[in-house]
Amino acid sequence: MQEQYRPEDIEQTIQEHWEKNNTFKVTEDNNKEKYYCLSMLPYPSGRLHMGHVRNYTIGDVISRYQRMLGKNVLQPIGWDAFGLPAEGAAVKNNTAPAPWTYENINYMKGQLKKLGFGYDWDREVTTCTPEYYRWEQWFFTKLYEKGLVYKKTSAVNWCPHDLTVLANEQVIDGCCWRCDTPVERKEIPQWFIKITDYAEELLNDLDTLDEWPEQVKTMQRNWIGRSEGVEITFDVADSDDTMTVYTTRPDTFMGVTYVAVAAGHPLAQKAAQNNPEIQHFIDECRNMKMAEAEMATMEKKGIATGLYAIHPLTQEKVAIWVANFVLMEYGTGAVMAVPGHDERDWEFATKYGLPIKAVIADAEGNQPDLSTGALTEKNSLINSGEFSGLDNQAGFNAIADKLTAMGVGERKVNYRLRDWGVSRQRYWGAPIPMATLEDGSVVPVPDDQLPVILPEDVKMDGITSPIKADPEWAKTTINGQPALRETDTFDTFMESSWYYARYTCPDYDKGMLDPKAANYWLPVDWYIGGIEHAIMHLMYFRFFHKLMRDAGLVNSDEPAKRLLCQGMVLADAFYYTGEDGARHWVSPAEAIVERDEKNRIIKATDSAGHELTYAGMSKMSKSKNNGIDPQTMVERYGADTVRLFMMFAAPPELTLEWQESSVEGANRFLRRLWRLVHEHTEKGTTQSLDLATLTTEQKDLRRDLHKTIAKVSDDVGRRLAFNTAIAAIMELMNKLTRAPQETEQDRALMQEALEAVVRMLSPIIPHACFVMWQALGGKEDIDVAPWPVADEEAMVDDTKLIIVQVNGKVRGRITVPANSEKDYVQEMATKEYSVAKYLENVTVRKVIYVPGKLLNIVVG
C-alpha cells in the first residue's frame, strides 16, 4: 500500500481485476438467498450525467452491501436504445441512428466501468437488437391472439415537431414531454393494448406494494381514476336515436338542463350535415392543440345542435350541444350537464344563457345562491320530486335504482385510464409484427418469420421514416399470400416494460423468458429510478408483468417489491442577458464567484467580463448549461470520492446539491482514512485482542466501534440512510485518530476497528477499500468479505452518565457504575461541587431517580 492516496494508480487496476475474475457474475443458486437490485436502464445519449451517477451509485452500494450479507446478488445493466433522439442526431451528423447509438453505448459503458459499478456485464441487454425485440414482437402477437391487442382509428395526441403520437401520459401541460411543443389532436389508425382490462387489478394491487413510495401509488391511483356511477340512456326527441351518458353524481340528475357531446359524436355529425356553422365548429374542435390536462383551464366553447334529449324521469326536453370540453375517447363521448352543481357546466351555461337549476341544498339545508358559481358539495337533495330530502348517498342509490328499474340506467365502474396506444410513426423503434393481406384482413406475422428486422443501414431525411419511404421493405408473404408489413414501430416504453425480466436470461433463445431463471430472480428486490416515471414507465412495467404472468412466463403478481425514487441533482445556475434580451446560460465551471462570510454568492462574472445573474440551485440540465461532467470529476478526484459525495451529501430520496467544496471534503476524509490505515500497517502485524485485559479507555473505544457497526448496519440495511451511516463512521474516525497506539492491545483494537471501517465503507468506496483491506491482511478480496457484526456485549455500558438536577434545573453530570442504586447516585451527586453548592442551607424534600439517566433533588 503506497503512502499517498492516488486514485489514478489503483482504480483502473482494480476494475481490470474485477473484470478478469468475473467478480460480479452470478448464476442461479437455490442454496443461497437471492437479491435482485436494479437501477432503471439508461438511454444511450452519449454521456452519463450526474443523475445517472447518483442512481447507479445508490444501486451499487445496496448491491455490494447485500453481497456482504452472503446473498446471491444480481445487479445488471443495459441500454434503452431505441428512441427519437437518435433520429435527430443521425440527421444532424449525416449518419444512421444505429451506429450513433452503438458508439454512445460503447463510450457510456466505459464511463460506468470507470465508476466501479459491480455489474454482471454478461447480462447486458441492448433493446435495439433483434435478439431482444424478437421476443417483444412474439409476445405482441400472442396478446393479439388473446384479444388483448386491437387497431382502431382514434383521436390521438400528435406532436407536430417530432411527427409522432404521444400517449396521454406523455403530454405534460398540453405539451410534448420530450420537446415541449404544443400538442395537437389528430385522427389516425393506431395499435392498442388493453390495459383497461387490468385497471381494477393494477389499482387493487397497489395496496400490496407496502415498500413503494406513497406518492407514486397516489399518482397511479389518480391516473387509473376509478369511479362508480350510472350510465344513463336518453331518447332523442322526434327521432329513433338515443344517447348515453355516464355520471358519478346521479343524485344531481333532476338538475340536468342540457347535455353536451364531443365533436366526433354521431349526433354532432348528424346535426352538422345541413349546418355549415356546426361543421365549422366541429372542425375547429378536431384541430385543437389540446390534451386532456388542459381541458380544465381552457375557454369552454360550444354550439347548439338544434336537437333535444328527453329527460327520462321528467320527460322534459333538454338541449343537445356540441362542446369543446367533451372528448369522444372518454366515456361515451357525451355528458349530462348540471350547471347548478358542477363548475364547468355552470361556466358554460352562464356563457350561453342556459338554465341553471338547484337540486342540492346548501350546508344549512336551504336553497343555494348559484349567481356566482356552482354548489359542488354533496348535501341533501331539493327540488327533486320524490327524491327531495334524501342525503347524498341515499339520493345516489334511489335515482340509480329507479333508472335501472326503468331500463334506462345501469350502474357502472369507470376508469380514467385509457388503453395503451403503442404505435409510433417513427423509424428508430421495433417494427410492429402485423401485416395486411390483399383482401384487407390484418394478421400477425407468424413465429417463424420473427423477428421483423428493422434495417439499420438507412439514410435519414428528418421527415419520413425510411421504412415508410421504402415500399419494398413492407412487402412480404404470409402463408403463401402477398402482404404488406405494418410500418409503424412500437412506443419505446414497450422495451422498458420487460427488460428487467430479460436480464434473468439474456441469452435464452427458446422463448421470451427462461421460467427457471425468471422465477428464481423475480420479483426485483430493490428498483431505483426517478419519480418522473410514476405514471408512464412504472405503470406499464406493472402491467407488462401481469401480462407475462397470465402467459405463464412469471409466477409473481408484481415486478418489484421495493421502489426507491432518488432525488434530482441540483447545481448553481448563472446567466447574463444578451443584447437580444435572451438569457445566455453560463456553466458554473466558467463562473468567477464572490461569496460572503456565510458562503452565499454575492457576485459572479464570466471570463468574457459579463456580469452574471445567479439563478439559484436548479436541476442539472442542458437548457441551463449547469451540468457537471462526471468524467471530469472522476479524473480530478477519483471514482471513490464522487461515489462518497453522492452518498453523503443528502438522503437518497431528497434532492442533492452539487457543491465542489463538499466533494473536496469527501476527498479529504478518504485521504485521512488512507493515511491512518497506512500508518497502522507500516508498524507491522498485530497480536490478537485480549478482551479480558482491556482498559476502561479501550473498552470505551471498542464500545463506540460496535455501536457504530450497529448504527451503520441499520442505516444501510433498513433505513437506506447512507448519509447518516457515513457521518457515524466519520465520528468514529475522529476517535480513532486520537486513540493512543502505545501498547499491543491499542494496536490490536485499532486493527479490529480499521477492518470494520474498511468493510463498512467498501460498498461506497470499493477501490480504496480493496487496497486497504489487503494492507490490513485480508486473506481474500474484500469483495467476498462478510459485513461486520456488532458485538452485543461490547456495546453494554459499564458506566452511565447521569444528569443531576436541583429543583428541575440541570446543575451537573456524574458518571456512575451502570447498575448503581439511587442512594449511591445521590451520594455521588452531593459530592460534585457544581451540585453541592445548591444544596447548602436547604432541606432536601424529595429525590426522584430515573435509573441510568437522571437524578432530580427537590429542595425547599
UniProtKB/Swiss-Prot annotation:
PROSITE patterns: AA_TRNA_LIGASE_I. InterPro entries: aa-tRNA-synth_I_CS, aa-tRNA-synth_Ia, Leu-tRNA-ligase, Leu_tRNA-synth_edit, M/V/L/I-tRNA-synth_anticd-bd, Methionyl/Leucyl_tRNA_Synth, Rossmann-like_a/b/a_fold, tRNAsynth_Ia_anticodon-bd. The keyword Disulfide bond does not apply. It is an enzyme of class 6 (ligase). One of its GO terms (molecular function) is leucine-tRNA ligase activity. Keywords: Aminoacyl-tRNA synthetase, ATP-binding, Cytoplasm, Ligase, Nucleotide-binding, Protein biosynthesis. GO terms for cellular component: cytosol. A motif ('KMSKS' region) lies at residues 619-623. ATP binds at K622. One of its GO terms (biological process) is leucyl-tRNA aminoacylation. Gene3D superfamilies: 2.20.28.290, 3.10.20.590, HUPs, Isoleucyl-tRNA Synthetase, Domain 1, Valyl/Leucyl/Isoleucyl-tRNA synthetase, editing domain. It comes from the Bacteria. A motif ('HIGH' region) lies at residues 42-52. It is found in: Cytoplasm. It catalyses: tRNA(Leu) + L-leucine + ATP = L-leucyl-tRNA(Leu) + AMP + diphosphate. Its EC number is 6.1.1.4. NCBIfam families: leuS_bact. Belongs to the class-I aminoacyl-tRNA synthetase family. This is Leucine--tRNA ligase.
